[in-house]
C-alpha cells in the first residue's frame, strides 16, 4: 500500500509531516510513502533513509491564503496537486495533506475524481465524545448549501465508514436539528428526516447539538454551513474550558498543589478530547481516500491521519460507498 503525502502543507511542515511519516513507517510494515515537495528540504529533514519512502519533487506550494480553485489550476507543480495526481494515476492508494482545505477539496474533486452516483462529496472529521468512542460529523464545509438527497448520501457514506473503519456493526445515524421531535427544523431537515427513514441506514432521528459529545449517534449528518459552525464551536469551547481549568488551578498556592494531584487525570481527559487522536477529516465520495489533517498538526496528528488513510484503503471504504449508494438508488 502506498500513500502520497503533501510534505509542504500545514503550519509545522515539513518537519512535523516527515516525523509523522517516519512514525507510521515504523508502525506499519505494509506502508509505503511518497513524500511530495521540495526534494532538498525534505531530504534535510529525513532522519534516516528507508526503501519504503520515495520523494517526489515539487517546486511550488499552495499557500493557506491562495484562492483554492485558482491555485489548483495555476500551480500544476505544487506539492498538493502532484500528490493528488499520484492517486489519480494509480501510483498511490490514498493521500493526505495538512494544507489549504479548499484547495485539497478542489484537487480531490477534480483530480482524484468523484464516485459515480455521488452528488456531492462531504468533509467529515471524527470528533471526541465523553465515552472516548467519538462520532463522525458530515459535512463540515465541502458544500455550505445542501439538498435533502445530499444529506441522505452523507448518512450512507458515514455509515459505511463507521462500520468499516470504526468497527461499529450497525452505526446510529442522526440528523443534526434544533429539537428531537420529528417535525422540528426547516424544510431541509424535515425533508431529510423523511428520506432517511426510507433508507437502509440505522437512522435514530433528530439529534440536538447539546447531545453530540454524549454520543447520541455514531454519525451525524448536516449541511456544510451548519457542520462547520458546529465543528468550530466544539473546538473553541474545548480550548476555552481547558484554559479556564488551567487559570483556576494555577491561581493560588493551594490550587497549584491540587493541580499537581489532578494532573494525570486532567491529561487523561485532555487526551480523550483531542480530536487529532481520531485522525484527520476524510473527504467522502471520492474514488480514493483523501484525508485532510489539521493545519496545526504535529507529528502525532500526521501519524493518526496516515493510520486513518491506511485503514480506509485496507477496508475498501470507497468501493463500499459506491456499492451502497448504487443499491440505495436501485431501491428508490
UniProtKB/Swiss-Prot annotation:
Catalysis: reaction(s): a fatty acyl-[ACP] + phosphate = an acyl phosphate + holo-[ACP]
UniProt KW RNA-binding keyword: no
GO cellular component: cytoplasm
Pfam families: FA_synthesis
SUPFAM superfamilies with a match to the protein in the record: Isocitrate/Isopropylmalate dehydrogenase-like (SSF53659)
Stretches of the chain forming a coiled coil according to its record: none
EC id: 2.3.1.274
Protein keywords: Cytoplasm, Lipid biosynthesis, Lipid metabolism, Phospholipid biosynthesis, Phospholipid metabolism, Transferase
InterPro entries attached to this UniProt entry: FA_synthesis, Phospholipid_synth_PlsX-like
GO BP, sorted A to Z: fatty acid biosynthetic process; phospholipid biosynthetic process
Metabolic or biological pathway, per its Swiss-Prot or TrEMBL entry: Lipid metabolism; phospholipid metabolism
GO molecular function, one term: phosphate:acyl-[acyl carrier protein] acyltransferase activity
Location within or outside the cell: Cytoplasm
PANTHER family to which the protein is assigned, alphabetical: FATTY ACID/PHOSPHOLIPID SYNTHESIS PROTEIN PLSX, PHOSPHATE ACYLTRANSFERASE
Family to which the UniProt record says this protein belongs: Belongs to the PlsX family.
NCBIfam families, alphabetized: plsX
Function of the molecule: Catalyzes the reversible formation of acyl-phosphate (acyl-PO(4)) from acyl-[acyl-carrier-protein] (acyl-ACP). This enzyme utilizes acyl-ACP as fatty acyl donor, but not acyl-CoA.
Oligomer status and interactors: Homodimer. Probably interacts with PlsY.
Designated name of the protein: Phosphate acyltransferase
Amino acid at each position: 500500500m502506498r500513500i502520497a503525502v503533501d510534505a509542504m502543507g500545514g503550519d509545522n511542515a515539513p518537519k512535523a509531516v516527515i516525523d509523522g511519516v517516519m512514525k507510521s513507517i515504523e508502525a506499519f510494515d505494509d506502508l509505503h510513502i511518497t513524500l511530495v515537495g521540495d526534494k532538498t528540504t525534505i531530504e534535510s529533514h529525513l532522519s534516516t533513509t528507508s526503501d519504503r519512502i520515495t520523494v517526489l519533487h515539487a517546486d511550488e506550494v499552495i499557500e493557506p491564503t491562495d484562492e483554492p480553485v485558482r491555485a489548483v489550476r495555476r500551480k500544476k507543480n505544487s506539492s498538493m496537486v502532484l500528490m493528488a495526481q499520484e492517486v489519480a494515476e494509480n501510483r498511490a492508494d490514498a493521500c493526505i495533506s495538512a494544507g489549504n482545505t479548499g484547495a485539497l477539496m478542489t484537487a480531490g474533486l477534480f483530480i482524484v475524481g468523484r464516485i459515480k452516483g455521488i452528488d456531492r462529496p462531504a468533509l467529515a472529521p471524527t470528533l471526541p465524545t465523553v465515552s472516548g468512542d467519538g462520532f463522525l460529523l458530515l459535512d463540515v464545509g465541502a458544500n455550505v448549501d445542501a439538498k435533502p438527497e445530499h444529506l441522505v448520501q452523507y448518512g450512507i457514506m458515514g455509515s459505511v465508514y463507521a462500520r468499516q473503519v470504526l468497527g461499529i456493526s450497525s452505526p446510529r445515524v442522526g440528523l443534526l436539528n434544533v429539537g428531537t421531535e420529528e417535525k422540528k427544523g426547516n424544510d431541509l431537515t424535515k425533508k431529510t428526516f423523511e428520506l432517511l427513514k426510507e433508507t437502509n441506514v440505522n437512522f435514530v432521528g433528530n439529534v440536538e447539538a447539546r447531545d453530540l459529545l454524549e454520543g447520541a449517534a455514531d454519525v451525524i449528518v448536516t449541511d456544510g454551513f451548519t457542520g462547520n459552525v458546529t465543528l468550530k464551536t466544539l473546538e473553541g469551547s474545548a480550548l476555552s474550558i481547558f484554559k479556564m481549568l488551567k487559570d483556576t488551578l494555577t491561581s493560588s498556592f493551594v490550587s497549584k498543589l491540587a493541580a499537581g494531584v489532578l494532573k494525570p487525570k486532567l491529561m487523561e481527559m485532555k487526551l480523550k478530547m483531542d480530536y487529532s487522536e481520531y485522525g484527520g477529516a476524510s473527504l467522502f465520495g471520492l474514488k480514493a481516500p483523501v484525508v485532510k489533517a489539521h493545519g496545526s498538526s504535529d507529528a502525532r496528528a500526521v501519524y493518526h491521519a496516515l493510520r486513518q488513510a491506511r485503514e480506509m484503503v485496507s477496508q475498501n471504504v470507497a468501493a463500499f460507498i459506491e456499492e451502497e449508494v448504487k443499491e440505495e438508488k436501485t431501491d428508490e
